[in-house]
């Protein structure tokens, strides 16, 4: 069957779900195995990757981890690099049934976008447009209502303790408010980076999301004592 390598920086593992969806919809495959891994803290990559983040001003400046891993916190001052690996199996219902496997979740849709805006900053307006467009498409496709599903929705945040302007925190909060309006405060926002650091392309958030669906347990950060923007 087909195989490929996805390189969308720290969105690579998540983007692979979209490729899997396309392959299944096109009847190219019946099952896709996604394997993701990154070891940027290892001896081979550390000087290059850490040096790049430090040069761009994105690396944390505080050497006390508990005071640094602060997603959405007003005190955040940069990210901590992490490492890890994850694997996922995406297959047709018939294949899972044949194997006697109970699926954890169903993929209803995906989207991928690139604003070509900046290497280390986000186009805040474009992020909001993409999220709103995706939710609108899912509403039409599956007969959903964003306000009805908001109280039962968990948003897994990518926020990596970025700067107050032009970073993940500002982009994500604005995108959610533009998309869900008055229902935004009914959403649960989960973020794993207070525990894992930023493991680049690994997809720890995807694995944590699926584990949360299976166990009804969510890992939220303790570092929101002084919420910023």
Residue spans for each PLM region:
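Short, solvent-exposed loop/turn and secondary-structure capping segments
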Residues: 44-47
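Short beta-strand segments
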Residues: 7, 32-38, 108
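Short conserved active-site loop signatures built around small residues
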Residues: 13
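Conserved "HGTGT" condensation-loop signature of ketosynthase/thiolase-family condensing enzymes
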Residues: 1, 22-25, 41, 52-80, ...
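Short, high-confidence coil segments that cap the C-terminus of an alpha-helix
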Residues: 28-30
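Active-site histidine-anchored catalytic micro-motif
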Residues: 16-17
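Short beta-strand-to-turn element immediately C-terminal to the catalytic PLP-Schiff-base lysine
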Residues: 90-92
């Amino acid at each position: 069957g087909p195989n490929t390598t996805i390189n969308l920086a720290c969105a690579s593992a998540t983007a692979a779900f979209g490729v899997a969806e396309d392959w299944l919809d096109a009847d190219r495959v019946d099952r896709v195995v996604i394997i993701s891994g990154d070891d940027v803290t290892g001896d081979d990559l550390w000087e290059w990757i850490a040096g790049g983040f430090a040069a761009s001003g994105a690396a944390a400046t505080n050497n006390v981890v508990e005071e640094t891993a602060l997603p959405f916190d007003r005190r955040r001052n940069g990210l901590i690099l992490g490492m890890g690996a994850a694997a996922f199996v995406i297959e047709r219902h018939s294949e899972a049934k044949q194997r006697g496997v109970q699926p954890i979740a169903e993929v209803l849709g995906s989207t991928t976008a690139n604003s070509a805006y900046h290497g280390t900053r986000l186009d805040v307006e474009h992020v909001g447009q993409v999220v709103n467009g995706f939710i609108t498409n899912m509403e039409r496709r599956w007969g959903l209502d964003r306000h009805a599903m908001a109280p039962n929705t968990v948003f897994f945040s990518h926020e990596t303790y970025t700067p107050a302007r032009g970073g993940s925190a500002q982009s994500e909060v604005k995108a959610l408010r533009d998309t869900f309006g008055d229902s935004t405060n009914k959403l649960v926002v989960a973020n794993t980076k207070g525990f894992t650091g930023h493991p680049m392309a690994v997809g720890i958030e995807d694995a944590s999301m699926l584990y949360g669906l299976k166990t009804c347990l969510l890992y939220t950060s303790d570092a929101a004592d002084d919420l910023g923007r």
